[in-house]
């Protein structure tokens, strides 16, 4: 059988991801003597998958259940999409259907991952935010399918009255992220691509878990976007990242479902081994290290304060690439088991395969 250029590209990229997912994440010294993941470079257009040629066909009309439990019937294969949520927009890029987007969430022009993978999205009409969704603006674009965050559940009936077919997503943990991938892959007739995406994530997390093994789990305090006195409890996605990286959440007793406000006294009482700043924190590592109120905290005293990667996207949000946050965190918490190079290789392979670019920065 003759191999097309697209088939050859996808095969090479899959090999790169397999190399990352299957490589033991050993220390940097050992990693330097082993082969790095194969380098694959591709433009966003080449990396995109053409559903009709490469995917398992979906039959329409199609009835799916979205992440609010709503049964939604999609009458015909959607050719135009609108996404009111950066997480679903990123997921649609990973599924290779970015060219079908006609409207995206507000501030798309500020998202680095869009400029690297699908710059045309940054000039598309905005359909607002979860707080201020532009119903009429979205309807004017006449999209075949609209994807919104579950926070907009009260607005969905109005969207439907305007003739829009709407799916809500709520990828608040690892399983629900996989559920969002399944939902959108099925809706957009990209099922095979969705399965590949999930397998890539699962394989890399499995490699991470195997590398960490039974290493002792340090306690981790995950600090929020606005203040070091915000933290993520077990109900938040960040908790799964800590667990995936072989750590224990210092705020495991917190019951809030969003960033919890805590006191300096509480942080000192928990006395975490590490303090990790959110990707989008509007303060920096030095400000925490120099905070006199935290001087007696083990993490500060030992200099174990880090910020999650943010150069490409916020990896502590439930986007497809969020597993890289766990890999990075694993390299911080368990440097003898998980090398920094392993994190770089995983990032290279993932973004090349699913977003069409090779990272210039891993921070």
Question: What is the meaning of each model-derived region?
Answer:
Residues 231-259, 263:
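Alpha-helical, coiled-coil/dimerization segments enriched in small aliphatic residues
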Residues 83-141, 145-147, 151, 250:
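A short, structured surface patch at a secondary-structure boundary
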Residues 127-130, 135-148, 164, 263-280:
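Proline-aspartate-enriched helix->loop->beta-strand connector
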């Amino acid at each position: 059988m003759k191999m097309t250029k697209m088939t050859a590209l996808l095969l090479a990229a899959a090999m790169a991801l397999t190399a990352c997912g299957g490589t033991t994440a050993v220390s940097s010294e050992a990693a330097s003597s082993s082969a790095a993941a194969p380098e694959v470079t591709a433009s966003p257009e080449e990396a995109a998958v053409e559903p009709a040629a490469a995917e398992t066909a979906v039959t329409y009309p199609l009835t799916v259940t979205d992440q609010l439990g709503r049964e939604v019937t999609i009458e015909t294969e959607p050719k135009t999409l609108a996404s009111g949520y950066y997480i679903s927009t990123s997921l649609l890029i990973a599924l290779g259907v970015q060219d079908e987007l006609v409207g995206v969430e507000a501030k798309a022009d500020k998202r680095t991952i869009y400029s690297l993978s699908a710059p045309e999205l940054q000039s598309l009409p905005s359909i607002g935010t979860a707080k201020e969704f532009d119903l009429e603006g979205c309807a004017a674009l006449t999209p075949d399918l609209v994807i919104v965050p579950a926070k907009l559940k009260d607005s969905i009936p109005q969207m439907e009255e305007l003739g829009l077919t709407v799916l809500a997503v709520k990828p608040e943990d690892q399983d629900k992220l996989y559920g969002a991938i399944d939902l959108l892959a099925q809706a957009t007739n990209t099922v095979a691509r969705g399965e590949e995406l999930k397998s890539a994530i699962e394989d890399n997390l499995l490699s991470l878990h195997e590398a960490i093994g039974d290493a002792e789990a340090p306690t981790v305090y995950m600090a929020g976007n606005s203040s070091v006195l915000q933290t993520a409890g077990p109900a938040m996605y960040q908790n799964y990242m800590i667990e995936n990286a072989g750590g224990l959440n210092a705020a495991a007793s917190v019951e809030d479902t969003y960033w919890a406000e805590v006191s300096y006294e509480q942080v000192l009482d928990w006395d975490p081994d590490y303090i990790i700043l959110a990707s989008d924190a509007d303060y920096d590592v030095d400000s925490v290290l120099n905070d006199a109120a935290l001087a007696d905290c083990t993490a500060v005293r030992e200099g174990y304060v880090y910020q999650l990667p943010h150069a490409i996207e916020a990896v502590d949000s439930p986007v497809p690439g969020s597993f890289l946050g766990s890999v990075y965190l694993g390299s911080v918490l368990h440097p003898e088991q998980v090398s920094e190079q392993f994190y770089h290789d995983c990032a290279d392979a993932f973004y090349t395969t699913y977003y069409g670019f090779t990272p210039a920065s891993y921070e």
